[in-house]
C-alpha cells in the first residue's frame, strides 16, 4: 500500500471508500448485524488504519480519524465505542510509528511542517523556510486579486499565477497547477460570485441533511444508508486541508457522486413522509 506509481495516493482511496464497509452488515445482513459487527468492524478498522498509515498519506489519516469521530459523536448508538476507538487507534498508530522507520520519518516531517506553519502565522510571515504547501497556498492571494469577482477562468490558475503582481522573479519556487485547496482554487478561477454560489449550495444541503437527520423527528432518523454519505460529504468539503484540483482531477466526480446520492436519499424519504 506504499504508493500508486510515483504518487502517495493509496491512503486517499482507503479513506474515501473504507467507511462504506462498516455499514455492509447492517444494510445487507441485518439478521447477523448484531452478532458479527462486534467482531468484523474492529478488524476492518485496524486493516484500514494500518493501510492508511503505511501508505505515507498524512492528510487521509487525519480525515479518516475525523470521519470516525464525527460518526461516533452524532450517532447515539455508536458513542459507547468512543473510548475503545481512541485506545485502538493509539495502540495501532504508535506501534507502527515505533516499528517502521519510514512512517516515523514521514510523521516527524509532517509535525515539523505544521510547526513551521504555526510559527510563520504567529511570528514571521516572510519566513524563508516555508513548507512547500504553504508556498503553494500563498500564491493564491495575489492571483485571486487579479480577478476578484469573476475569476480568471477554469484551469487558468496555472497561467495567472506566473503573471501575478509582486511576484519575486529571483525566487526558485515555481507556481503549481492549482493552489492545493478546493476553496482557494474556486476563488481564483470563478471569483467571489462562483465561490458564493457553490458555498451557499453546500451549506444549504448540509443544513437540510443535519436538520432532518439529527434535530427533528423524520424518516431520516432511522435511515442507516445515508450515514456514510453524510460524513464523507462533510469531510470532502472540509475547508482546512490540502486537496487535489477541484476542476482537473477525479475529486469533483467523487464529491458530486456523494452529493447526488445524498440528495436522492433525502428526496426519497421526504416523498415517503408526505405520502404517509
Locations of the language-model features?
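Alpha-helical transmembrane segments of multi-pass inner-membrane proteins
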Residues: 5-77, 84-88, 98, 204-211, ...
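Membrane-interface loop/short-helix elements at transmembrane-helix boundaries
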Residues: 112-162, 175-185
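Membrane-interface catalytic loops of GT-C/OST-like multi-pass glycosylation enzymes that act
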Residues: 2-8, 53-63, 177-181, 240-254
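Transmembrane alpha-helices of multi-pass inner-membrane enzymes
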Residues: 23, 65-69, 226-276
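A conserved mid-to-late transmembrane alpha helix and its immediate loop/hinge
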Residues: 6, 53, 138-141, 147-150, ...
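Hydrophobic transmembrane alpha-helices and their immediate junctions
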Residues: 69, 73, 78, 82, ...
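Transmembrane signal-anchor hairpin modules in multi-pass inner-membrane enzymes, especially those
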Residues: 28-39, 79-83, 215-224, 266-276
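A membrane-periplasm/extracellular boundary helix in multi-pass inner-membrane enzymes
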Residues: 75-123, 138-146, 154
Amino acid at each position: 500500500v506504499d504508493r500508486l506509481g510515483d504518487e502517495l495516493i493509496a491512503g486517499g482511496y482507503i479513506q474515501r471508500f473504507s467507511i462504506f464497509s462498516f455499514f455492509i452488515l447492517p444494510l445487507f445482513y441485518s439478521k447477523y448485524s448484531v452478532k458479527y459487527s462486534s467482531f468484523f468492524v474492529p478488524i476492518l478498522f485496524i486493516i484500514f488504519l494500518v493501510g492508511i498509515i503505511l501508505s505515507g498519506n498524512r492528510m487521509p489519516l487525519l480525515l479518516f480519524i475525523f470521519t470516525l469521530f464525527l460518526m461516533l459523536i452524532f450517532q447515539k448508538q455508536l458513542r459507547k465505542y468512543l473510548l475503545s476507538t481512541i485506545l485502538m487507534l493509539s495502540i495501532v498508530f504508535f506501534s507502527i510509528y515505533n516499528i517502521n522507520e519510514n512512517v516515523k520519518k514521514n510523521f516527524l516531517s509532517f509535525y515539523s511542517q505544521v510547526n513551521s506553519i504555526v510559527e510563520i502565522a504567529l511570528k514571521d510571515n516572510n519566513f524563508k523556510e516555508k513548507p512547500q504547501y504553504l508556498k503553494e497556498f500563498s500564491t493564491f492571494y495575489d492571483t485571486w486579486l487579479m480577478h476578484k469577482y469573476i475569476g480568471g477562468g477554469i484551469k487558468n490558475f496555472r497561467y495567472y499565477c506566473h503573471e501575478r503582481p509582486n511576484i519575486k522573479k529571483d525566487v526558485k519556487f515555481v507556481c503549481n497547477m492549482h493552489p492545493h485547496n478546493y476553496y482557494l482554487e474556486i476563488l481564483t478561477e470563478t471569483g467571489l460570485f462562483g465561490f458564493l454560489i457553490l458555498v451557499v449550495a453546500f451549506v444549504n444541503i448540509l443544513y437540510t441533511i443535519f436538520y432532518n437527520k439529527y434535530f427533528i423527528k423524520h424518516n431520516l432518523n432511522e435511515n442507516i444508508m445515508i450515514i456514510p454519505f453524510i460524513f464523507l460529504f462533510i469531510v470532502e468539503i472540509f475547508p482546512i486541508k490540502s486537496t487535489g484540483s477541484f476542476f482537473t482531477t477525479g475529486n469533483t466526480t467523487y464529491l458530486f457522486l456523494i452529493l447526488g446520492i445524498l440528495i436522492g436519499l433525502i428526496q426519497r424519504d421526504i416523498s415517503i413522509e408526505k405520502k404517509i
